[in-house]
Amino acid sequence: MKVLQLALFILLPAFASAQKPAPVCKCPDTTFVSSAAKPLKIFHFSNGRSIGLFGYEETKLITGKTLYSEFVLSECGAKKVIDFWGAVLTCDVTFANDTVYVKTLYGFPVGRAMKPEYLPWTIERIYFSGGKAIRKLMINPAIPKYTPAQVAMVFKQYQQAPNENSDATIDLADKLLISTMSGSKKAKYLLVNFKNKFTTLDGAPAEAYDTIMRMLGLWEKM
C-alpha cells in the first residue's frame, strides 16, 4: 500500500502539469463595459467554446434571484462582443442544453388585481451551429392574457383617467398593451392614439410609452 501511495505521489505532479489551464475569458475592448471587467458568468459549450457575461448584477427586483443589467455577452477569445443589453433592460440569463437563454423582463399588469408582475417579454437563444454563434429571438408565448371582463375594465379606466404625466398613465398604457395582445382591436386603437388623450406625456413617462409602442411593433412582427 505504501508503495502504491508513493507511486501516486510521484505521478500526481505529472498529471497536474499535463492538465490544460482554465480558459481565460476577457471582455473585448468596447465602450459598453471595461476591458478589465471580470466575467460574472462563463458558459461552457460542448464544442469547447465559451461565452462570458460582463456587466452588472441586479438582486433587488426579484427576491432570491440574480438578474443582469447593462451587460455584454462575448465569446471568450473573440475580438468583438455578441451584443450589449443596456441599463434600461433587466434580464434573466441562464444556460441549458448547450444554449444561453437571455430573457428580458418587464412588469406586466397581469398579477392579482392587475398589479405588475415581472415576466419574460422576449426570450433569446444563443447557441453554436456549424462553428457559428446563432441567435434566435421570440416573444414569450406564456404572457397571460386578459379576459373580456378585464378588457372592459381597462376601457372604463381609460375613460375615467385624467390627462396627467404620471406612472398611473403608463400603467394604463401597459394594460392596453395586454388588452391588445388579448385580441382587442379597440385597445390597439386607443394605445396607438394614446397621446391624443394624454397630451402632457413628458420625460420618463414619455420614454416608457415609446418603449410600449416598440413592444407593440415587435409583437405585431412576430
Write out the residue ranges for each language-model feature:
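Bacterial Sec-dependent N-terminal signal peptides
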Residues: 1-24
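Exposed acidic/polar residues on beta-strands and adjacent loops within beta-sheet cores, strongest
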Residues: 19-222
